[in-house]
């Protein structure tokens, strides 16, 4: 839902949405300043292995999910960053690095520079 996201952003919070490429395109249309991170599997075989390890899906569902993952990969070029999900700790560190970099962008702090020095940061 859009309203809680907008409220959190207005409060200065960062928001993480787990959505597919189509959802990401809708967010980008509504909020061009949104930062998009595409989570890549270490390999296509890793996706299948992970799904089989869970032992919760039928063969048909596993094959459908693998095919969907391939389709999603076709859209990774529309994202700002790529994170490879081969290790949870490493993926977390990559997300953290993106967050820190984005929060420190000069463009996000123009008013601070102006207040500090009485000049434009541009």
Residue spans for each PLM region:
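Alpha-helical elements of Rossmann-like donor-binding domains used by nucleotide-donor carbohydrate transfer enzymes
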Residues: 4, 68, 94-98
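ATP-dependent NMP and nucleoside kinases share a basic, alpha-helical "lid"
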Residues: 1-56, 73
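An acidic, carboxylate-rich microenvironment
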Residues: 46, 60-61, 90
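Residue-level signature of catalytic and energy-coupling elements of molecular machines
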Residues: 16, 69, 83
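NTP-dependent small-molecule kinase module
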Residues: 56-57, 74-122
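Glycine-rich S-adenosyl-L-methionine
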Residues: 59-68
């Amino acid at each position: 839902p859009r309203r809680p996201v907008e409220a959190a952003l207005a409060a200065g919070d960062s928001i993480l949405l787990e959505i597919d490429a189509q959802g990401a395109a809708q967010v980008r249309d509504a909020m061009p300043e949104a930062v998009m991170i595409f989570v890549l599997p270490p390999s296509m075989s890793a996706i299948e292995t992970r799904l089989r390890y869970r032992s919760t899906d039928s063969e048909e569902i596993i094959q459908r999910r693998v095919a969907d993952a391939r389709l999603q990969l076709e859209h990774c070029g529309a994202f700002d960053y790529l994170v490879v999900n081969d290790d949870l700790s490493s993926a977390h560190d990559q997300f953290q690095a993106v967050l820190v970099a984005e929060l420190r962008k000069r463009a996000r702090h123009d008013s601070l520079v102006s207040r500090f020095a009485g000049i434009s940061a541009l």
